[in-house]
């Protein structure tokens, strides 16, 4: 499970991504070049800041806020964005709240957002941009064409990184079946997996911001990454030191800086190998990752299998009778495991992706 970064910002972007009725209204105001100030919130704290204006209390529609924004004052919408409460209102936030904005709308929006921790949107009349504030967050919404271009570039980069990861993983697969994997091979595979996942995170941010215009990017992303994260977690589980919790190790690796991620010794240290030579240290996998590739074998059976034998090499050496002794594995399943591992070994020998 990936650590969630910028979760609050992602929630904000989801609310006003292309395809939503709020974004349609914002774009209408932007095209009309009238400018506007919109606050999303209907609690007492917001309503206490409202001075004057018209109490509309009408159902929200993009056309309504486009027309109402022609007046100078602010619009106040309910938090669920279903109703327009006030139009042409003057907002009176605490003037002592610091702001580095210059325009009146933007200064008011930032102060309201900081004071109430609600979303305030300022639409610039001259610069033709939409700026969103909430608490200490400030974000300028970008044009969909710009984001789409960045997302396509990121997809191309991801394709190259996935190709490298596949080569590294194929090499590790061969070595695992021969029980010749070194710490260097393992840390390289973990490093490459994390690099891929960081690009995936970036693309997911673009997809949220693109809204319904990001469907094709989303499909391309799903096609490229498939089970990469799951394989990466199982890889850590295969090789981390016995008393270490693999999910904690995964979180630590996610927290590494871009510079630290390039240092394989640091990744080895996170796995519990301190002061070991990467190239000279042979390591044996427990077998979670390879066993997960066997068709129609439930995860609880894989847990029992690895728990019983301890290492992949012992699972590979085991006969049907030995496999049959494991809880949850009968005669039929023992044959399925043996045949599954044999087919995986053949695929690996042919240098095919699992």
Swiss-Prot record:
Function recorded in the entry: Participates in a DNA-damage check-point that is active prior to asymmetric division when DNA is damaged. DisA forms globular foci that rapidly scan along the chromosomes during sporulation, searching for lesions. When a lesion is present, DisA pauses at the lesion site. This triggers a cellular response that culminates in a temporary block in sporulation initiation.
Record's protein name: DNA integrity scanning protein DisA
Positions contributing to ATP binding: 73, 91, 104-108
Gene: disA
EC number: 2.7.7.85
Example of a GO MF term: DNA binding
Reaction catalysed by this enzyme: 2 ATP = 3',3'-c-di-AMP + 2 diphosphate
A family per Pfam: DAC
GO BP field: DNA repair
Record domain DAC: where: 6-144
Essential cofactor(s): Mg(2+)
Xref: Gene3D superfamilies: 5' to 3' exonuclease, C-terminal subdomain (1.10.150.20), DNA integrity scanning linker region (1.20.1260.110), DNA integrity scanning protein, DisA, N-terminal domain (3.40.1700.10)
Subunit structure: Homooctamer.
Keywords: ATP-binding, DNA damage, DNA repair, DNA-binding, Magnesium, Nucleotide-binding, Nucleotidyltransferase, Transferase
Family to which this protein belongs: Belongs to the DisA family.
SUPFAM superfamilies cross-referenced by the UniProt entry: RuvA domain 2-like, YojJ-like
């Amino acid at each position: 499970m990936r650590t969630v970064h910028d979760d609050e910002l992602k929630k904000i972007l989801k609310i006003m991504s292309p395809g939503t009725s709020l974004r349609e209204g914002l774009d209408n105001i932007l095209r009309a070049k009238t400018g506007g100030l919109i606050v999303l919130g209907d609690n007492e704290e917001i309503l206490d800041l409202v001075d004057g204006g018209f109490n509309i209390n009408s159902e929200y529609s993009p056309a309504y806020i486009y027309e109402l924004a022609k007046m100078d004052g602010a619009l106040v919408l309910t938090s669920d964005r279903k109703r327009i409460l006030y139009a042409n209102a003057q907002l009176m936030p605490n003037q002592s709240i610091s702001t580095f904005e210059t325009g009146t709308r933007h200064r008011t929006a930032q102060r309201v957002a900081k004071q109430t921790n609600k979303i305030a949107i300022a639409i610039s009349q001259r610069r033709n941009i939409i700026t969103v504030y909430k608490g200490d967050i400030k974000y300028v919404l970008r044009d969909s064409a710009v984001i789409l271009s960045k997302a396509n570039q990121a997809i191309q980069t991801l394709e190259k990184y996935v190709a490298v990861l596949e080569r590294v993983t194929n090499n590790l697969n061969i070595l695992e079946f021969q029980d010749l994997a070194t710490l260097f091979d393992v840390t390289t595979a973990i490093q490459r997996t994390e690099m891929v996942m960081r690009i995936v995170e970036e693309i997911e941010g673009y997809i949220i911001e693109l809204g319904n215009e990001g469907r094709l990017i989303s499909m391309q992303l799903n096609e490229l990454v498939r089970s990469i994260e799951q394989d990466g977690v199982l890889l850590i589980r295969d090789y981390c030191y016995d008393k270490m919790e693999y999910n904690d190790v995964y979180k630590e690796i996610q927290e590494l800086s871009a510079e630290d991620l390039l240092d394989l010794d640091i990744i080895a240290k996170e796995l519990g190998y301190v002061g070991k030579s990467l190239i000279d240290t042979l390591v044996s996998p427990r077998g979670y990752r390879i066993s997960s590739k066997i068709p129609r074998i439930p995860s609880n059976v894989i847990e029992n299998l690895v728990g019983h034998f301890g290492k992949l090499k012992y699972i590979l050496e085991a006969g049907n009778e030995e496999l049959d002794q494991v809880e949850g594995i009968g005669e039929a399943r023992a044959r399925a495991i043996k045949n599954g591992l044999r087919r995986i070994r053949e695929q690996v020998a042919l240098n095919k992706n699992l």
